[in-house]
Amino acid sequence: MTALELVDPDRLSLFRYGVLTWIDKDGFPFSVATDFLLSENGEILLKKPSAHPTMMGADVAVLFNHITGIPTGGYTDRRYMLVWGRVSEDKGFLKLHPEEVSEWDEKVLPFDKLCAAAVPQGKKYLESLQPSIDA
């Protein structure tokens, strides 16, 4: 599956940077912010972090997000895109090979409706924990 089949380049272009996360060789999560660009054929190219431990071929997550603070308090214009996949070296960049995407944009789905939609999943999760709490 290509990046264009999973990731809408128009929506991705609304973000200025990504946060690249992977599990390092010692088993700990490692995250670093990085710039990115979209190639003419829709590939997601991440700028290599200056100190980038080996992550080639490993599962990675890249979080692209945006939030605007309101001077009087609170936030607006919230959105994110989380892309799971793998990276490979490509002409001085890290090419992201997307495998799964989740995203949210409050202009499409307001925050209160997002929370309401998550209630069944949260309830199922809490019910699965109940036996261990009762023990």
Language model: regions and residue ranges:
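Binding-site signature for planar aromatic cofactors or substrates
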Residues: 1-135
